[in-house]
Amino acid sequence: MTKKTSNLVMAVANDNGNGWAKTYCQFEDGTGNTTITPSLYAPVSKHETIPDLEESNEVQDFNDNMDVLIKSPSLKTTSEYLVGKAAINSGNNLIDYNVEANLGKVTPDISMIMPLAKIAYAALNHILSVAKYIPTTININLAYYLTCLPISEFVNKERRKTLCKKL
C-alpha cells in the first residue's frame, strides 16, 4: 500500500569520516539505528540505465543500495548519486574526501551528500519497519543534528559558521 506523505521527527548524530560515515538516527518512538557506510559517492550518468524495482514492504540491505536525487541550495545543483557500496559497485567515477587537497570537511559536497542520503534512507527504513508501506514523500523534522569537524576546522569560527549555513 502506498501512502502519499509520512512525517517523521528524528535526531541524528553523524560522523563523516575520511573512510567511513558513521550515523546514528533516533526516531520519536524511541527506536534508532546506527549505520556505517563507505564515505564516497558516484554521480549517476544521464545515460545510465538503472533497473526498476518492484514495490516491496522490505528494503534489503538499504544501506548498501543508496541511490538518491538531491536538490539542495547548499550544493547549487540537482543531481542523482549512488552512495557508499552502491557507488563502489557501479563502476562509475568515485568521489571521496580528498585528504591531500587540504579542503577539510566544510567545503566538499560529500559533507552534505553523505548525511542527506543516510538520513533519507534511515527514514524510509523506519517507515517500512513500523508502518509497512512506501510513502511518496517523507517530511523529516530534524529535532537535533550533531556532526563532527576536525579540530583544525572547529577552532576556526568562520568554518563553523559556514558549515551551519550549509546545513
State what each model feature region is.
Residues 1-18, 22-167:
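Nucleotide/phosphate-binding catalytic cleft detector across ATP-hydrolyzing
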